[in-house]
Amino acid sequence: MSILSLVTAPDPILKKVSSPVDTVNDSIRQLIDDMLETMYHNHGVGLAAPQVAVSKRIIVLDLSKVDIEEDNITNSEYKYPLFMVNPIVKAISNQTVTAKEGCLSLPKQAIEVSRYHEIQVTYLDYYNKLKTLNAAGWLARAIQHEVDHLDGILLVDYLSNLKKEATLNTLSKIKDAAYDK
């Protein structure tokens, strides 16, 4: 496995809608393994392929080490880490919850976002099998966050234009300072 380079805002690849994967083959599995290694290396709980400069509909998640009140996987046969290819999310309740989220592509930022509390996600797994998972709480939030990346949506897109511009300017300064070292 390899640790891949993370892409940070305002990189244009993060604003693209990702392409579906035709089949989960060995090269896709290698990408999934590398994404998982990259996510762990950067202390993340989720990662989408566009965050490593790959415009494919793939996400990886692992909330097992996060201290959260509720992390509901309501299908007991599912264990972490989760690998989702071509995920399709639908709400199974109209209840939304607002909470702060962070993102590996938006370092040092925490942004409040309202998301569905309960969802159902259909996807291809690591072995190209079609799966359906019902999720609630933080897992549902994390899945929705990562799927946003596949649709070219970033946390800053939930902010007003003024706050969005200020946040992106801050990120540019952080990035510039890192390159100057």
UniProtKB/Swiss-Prot annotation:
Top enzyme class: hydrolase
One example GO MF annotation: metal ion binding
Catalytic activity: N-terminal N-formyl-L-methionyl-[peptide] + H2O = N-terminal L-methionyl-[peptide] + formate
Keywords linked to the UniProt accession: Hydrolase, Iron, Metal-binding, Protein biosynthesis
Entry annotation: catalytic residues: 146
Keyword Protein biosynthesis: yes
One of the protein's GO biological processes: translation
Cofactors, names only: Fe(2+)
Its EC number(s): 3.5.1.88
Cofactor stoichiometry and binding remark: Binds 1 Fe(2+) ion.
Top-rank taxon: Bacteria
Presence of the UniProt keyword Coiled coil in the record: no
Residues the record lists as binding Fe cation: 103, 145, 149
Function: Removes the formyl group from the N-terminal Met of newly synthesized proteins. Requires at least a dipeptide for an efficient rate of reaction. N-terminal L-methionine is a prerequisite for activity but the enzyme has broad specificity at other positions.
Membership in a protein family: Belongs to the polypeptide deformylase family.
NCBIfam families noted in UniProt: pept_deformyl, PRK00150.1-3
Name of the protein: Peptide deformylase
